[in-house]
Design a protein with these regions (language model features):
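Terminal interaction module
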Residues: 18, 116-200
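Core of folded catalytic or high-affinity ligand/protein-binding domains
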Residues: 72-130
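N-terminal start-of-chain detector that recognizes signal peptides
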Residues: 15-20, 59-62, 96-98
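A glycine-rich, hydrophobic loop/mini-helix early in the fold
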Residues: 33-88, 94
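A short linear-motif detector with a strong N-terminal bias
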Residues: 22-27, 66-69, 101-105
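Charge-rich, low-complexity segments
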Residues: 1-55, 166-200
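Conserved NTP-handling cores and scaffolds of large molecular machines
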Residues: 11, 66-70, 112
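Generic structural motif recognizing short loop/turn segments at the entrances and edges of beta-strands
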Residues: 2-3, 14-20, 25-27, 39-45, ...
Length: 200
């Protein structure tokens, strides 16, 4: 950044730091203790769909790499497209196998980034679920979203019932609980709703 950037109030964009994803397992322990949320075992990487053989090759390689994991149980890695035209590469692991799920997400992001598709990466999300509301737990679902281009996390908690409403109170409680574990996105207007994301 130069002097002119400082005078005009411009800021330098934060470089993505994919290693921040590895803080999720310890953050999950905090979430369970603070707001009774546990991992669902589902995580996904969202990217803008690109047409072309090069991108298809990378996508196939990443999928084959993750499916080759001998320890993987359950369904293979899948690719879903949402109503907005974005693609989600979805990995499913056991609910207590969060470190392996995080490694999957890191591998997908790293592969796309190293092959020149970093600008297409949007976010990664790991799903969590709460206990029944009647027992004093959080209830419902929550996604911890990693914004690739900002290098930050934020919580997204859609309310059950099919409407497009979010549980803002739960999101703020999660932000407070994880302040020491994750780099939380400070600008609330960047806490984009990811309606229909896999695992939520």
């Amino acid at each position: 950044m130069g002097l002119l950037d400082i005078i005009l109030g411009r800021t330098k964009p934060v470089a993505p730091d994919l290693d921040r994803l590895f803080a999720l397992p310890s953050a999950a322990v905090t979430l369970e203790a603070a707001v009774s949320l546990t991992p669902t075992g589902t995580g996904a990487v969202c990217f803008a769909t690109v047409e072309g053989a090069a991108f298809d090759d990378v996508r196939r390689e990443v999928r084959a790499l993750l499916d080759a994991d001998a320890a993987r149980t359950g369904p293979p890695v899948g690719i879903e497209r949402d109503e907005y035209g974005y693609s989600w590469l979805v990995s499913r692991r056991g609910p207590r196998d969060l470190p392996a799920l995080v490694s999957d997400l890191h591998a997908v992001n790293s592969a796309l980034e190293s092959d020149g598709f970093g600008p297409q990466l949007l976010c990664s999300v790991v799903g969590f679920r709460g206990e029944d509301e009647g027992e004093g737990g959080a209830g419902g679902r929550l996604g911890l979203v990693y914004l690739y281009k900002r290098g930050t996390f934020y919580p997204f908690a859609p309310l059950p019932g099919g409407g497009r409403r979010r549980d803002s109170a739960l999101e703020l409680r999660v932000r407070a609980a994880l302040a020491d574990d994750l780099r939380i996105e400070p600008e609330l207007d960047r806490w984009f709703p990811i309606w229909g994301a896999p695992g939520l």
